[in-house]
Amino acid sequence: MWLPLPLLLGLLQLQPILSYQIDWNKLERINRGKVESCGGUQLNRLKEVKGFVTEDLPLYHNLEMKHIPGADPELVLITSRYEELERIPLSDMKRDEINQLLKDLGFYRKSSPDAPVPAEFKMAPARASGDTKEDL
């Protein structure tokens, strides 16, 4: 069986995001996140990730940047007690894939860095007990 070239290329573009499967049982206590990365050397070679870090990350509520010299870019998911739940490597992801992952995880994206966060999203991405991805 063969696939048409456009479909095959489309599937290949989805590969990085499909390589990380969200385990909702493990991440049910997610409350916030941070992106850890070096400030220059790694990011300058990763244009998509650098675009996300410099332009998109400031728009997300409960998501912060932490510069660590020499560190590969990772999304670190954290509980309300600052316990680490998961580390997701970002180096192989495209900017839109990182944004989609954050959306899937329930992070709220503001229209501008200074925009207010609606009351219902103040605790995002935290979910009430029993909420599922479909409830987001």
From Swiss-Prot:
Keyword Signal included in the entry's annotation: yes
Residues at the active site: C38, U41
Protein name per Swiss-Prot or TrEMBL: Selenoprotein M
Primary site of residence: endoplasmic reticulum
Subcellular location: Endoplasmic reticulum
Region (Disordered): 111-136
Extent of the signal sequence: 1-19
Gene3D superfamilies, sorted: Sep15/SelM thioredoxin-like domain, active-site redox motif (3.40.30.50)
GO molecular function, one term: oxidoreductase activity
Residue window of motif Prevents secretion from ER: 133-136
Gene Ontology cellular-component annotations: endoplasmic reticulum lumen
Endoplasmic reticulum as UniProt keyword: yes
Keywords: Endoplasmic reticulum, Selenocysteine, Signal
Gene source species: Xenopus laevis
Pfam family, one: Sep15_SelM
Phylogenetic lineage: Eukaryota, Metazoa, Chordata, Craniata, Vertebrata
Record-listed cross-link Cysteinyl-selenocysteine (Cys-Sec), residues: C38-U41
